[in-house]
From Swiss-Prot:
Assembly information from the UniProt record: Interacts with OXA1L.
Protein family membership: Belongs to the mitochondrion-specific ribosomal protein mL49 family.
Subcellular location per the Swiss-Prot or TrEMBL entry: Mitochondrion
PANTHER family to which the protein is assigned, alphabetical: LARGE RIBOSOMAL SUBUNIT PROTEIN ML49, MITOCHONDRIAL 39S RIBOSOMAL PROTEIN L49
Highest taxon of the lineage: Eukaryota
The protein's name in its UniProt record: Large ribosomal subunit protein mL49
GO BP term (any one): translation
Cystines in this chain: none
Molecular function per GO: structural constituent of ribosome
GO CC annotation terms, alphabetical: mitochondrial large ribosomal subunit; mitochondrial ribosome
Alphabetical keyword list: Mitochondrion, Ribonucleoprotein, Ribosomal protein
Positions of region (Disordered): 56-78
Amino acid sequence: MAVTMFRAALRGWRTDVQRGCGLRLLSQTQGPPDYPSFVESVDEYQFVERLLPATRIPDPPKHEHYPTPSGWQPPRDPPPNLPYFVRRSRMHNVPVYKDITHGNRQMTVIRKVEGDIWALQKDVEDFLSPLLGKTPVTQVNEVTGTLRIKGYFDQELKAWLLEKGF
């Protein structure tokens, strides 16, 4: 009972305070703040453009003879008439990579395969069988367009794909 009377006394004591007189009431009485004006200058934008990264990798320059000293070679102009196509990476290289997992499992990966990936698997097996003396172990992933071959054959497969015109 004493607590209730104390609360009532406190409520009566704060009667002169208006409820809700916070930021909302103050913002309605004042105008918008005065911001300093600005000047838009396009003359200096060339310095900003130098800092922005390029949106795409530029096309490689034309050379007198191929392969270049670095070993790069462009794809054949009419693409080869095969049921599959191996697209170049964004740096214009043949997408054949070495992969090692679990410390000693060596794999070669061909990425960016479009079309009939099973025909590519058969051609790769026909190409590598004389080198190995047996049929290589391969794994096809149709969803990601990758072909994995057990062992390191990246240099041989890159040369073979370049010879085919990819």
